[in-house]
Amino acid sequence: MSPDSSPFSTMSAGALAGYKVVDLTRVLGGPYCTMILADHGAEVIKVEPPQGDETRDWGPPFNDKGESAYYQGVNRNKRSIGLDLSSEAGKAVLGKLLEDADVLIENFKPGTLEKWGLGYKDVLAERYPRLVHCRVTGFGADGPLGGFPGYDAVIQAMSGMMSVNGSPESGPVRVGTPMVDMGTGLNAAIAILMALLERGKSGKGQFLDITLYDSAVALLHPQGNNYLMSGKPPVITGNAHPNVYPYDVFPTKDKDLFLAVGNNGQFKRLADAVEAPELAVDPRFKDNADRSSNRGALKALLAEKLAQYECEPLALGLLQKGVPAGPVNTIPDVMEHPHTIFRQMRVGAENGYGALGVQAKLSRTPGGARSGPPKFGSATRAVLSEAGISADEIETLINDGVALVDRRK
């Protein structure tokens, strides 16, 4: 099925058209946040240091221009400028960019902007009272861990996330995707949108303090809440759910199947579907609490039945009967799946760019991939000109190494 047959094909200027975001972030959490904003029409000016966002080099794989899939995946729809913020002239240029900006987002070590004379409370809030300043850090500026840098895998470990991921045999395991970084990016985007909505009422901007640590701890449901209620430390259960069963991976003839049975009706329909109606009336499995307490016995009985079926038709049949079930797909399986294509979650833009799609579909103002990730410094001259800097001044800034159109190696 081609993307053109999807009901989401039309693209608009976007719900955030007219908003300007000055993006000083690099790596993942911040760039993911600003890509979400850019997908929905915000003008995002990606201000890169002279060496560029280091993720441009995080590969392989690389495209034919030598840029990594990692960088390409979270930087579409943006305009890139190179700017040396360690220089006074660079800071002055940043000040010009902020004059008509709605949002400033950065992920420097806490205190960096203050050291540069650009702290929110003392400078930015006074000079740009409508500016929303979002700071993304590992742990925040204060508290026992305040000021330390944060990294996704380290925060997964420190937050307790790894302690409940994996199996008794494997021990703690890092989640395969950078959930903390990306969850933090989502939280930053949500916070920015809330602040812009509130600004429409008050006329004032505000400072947003978003951390990887907070984002990771907030994801500890239900294990964190189970502990707060029971006082019992959660343990690693592998793929199984700590509160619900059968909620686990089961082998079939050809591929693993995941079941997520959450109530008695679903369990009865599952039992009927695998020609084992006796399971639904077995007193050991009469409700979720019993099924969860007797999960070992139930898993063995279900595994014996499920092994007789091929995964894909079984999963589809269960879904049609209202039983939550799905094959354990590989990444290639997902990228080629007709539903992925139908939902436009695999998209292309200019220059052969291909990436994951836009997850929020809006009916009147849909977003999308308007342009691929920018070449370093490709908008430097244009953005500085739009900020009121003359052509002669721009060339002087470039010649002095303050503004850049090519990466400094």
Say what each PLM segment does.
Residues 1-201, 375, 381-409:
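N-terminal helix-loop segment corresponding to the beta1-alpha1 unit
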Residues 51, 138-140, 212-217, 254, ...:
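Glycine-rich beta-alpha junction loops
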Residues 245-321, 325:
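Aromatic-enriched alpha-helical interface/lid elements that frame and gate functional surfaces
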Residues 237-242, 247-248, 350-353, 372-375:
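Short Gly/Pro-enriched turn/cap motifs at secondary-structure boundaries
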Residues 141, 169-177, 200-216, 235-242, ...:
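Conserved Rossmann-fold dehydrogenase catalytic segment
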Residues 281-291, 329-336, 393-409:
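Short linear loop/turn motifs
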Residues 185-205, 218-230, 271-278:
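Oxidoreductase and adenylate-handling cofactor-binding alpha/beta cores
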Residues 320-370:
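A glycine-rich dinucleotide-binding beta-alpha-beta segment and adjacent secondary-structure elements
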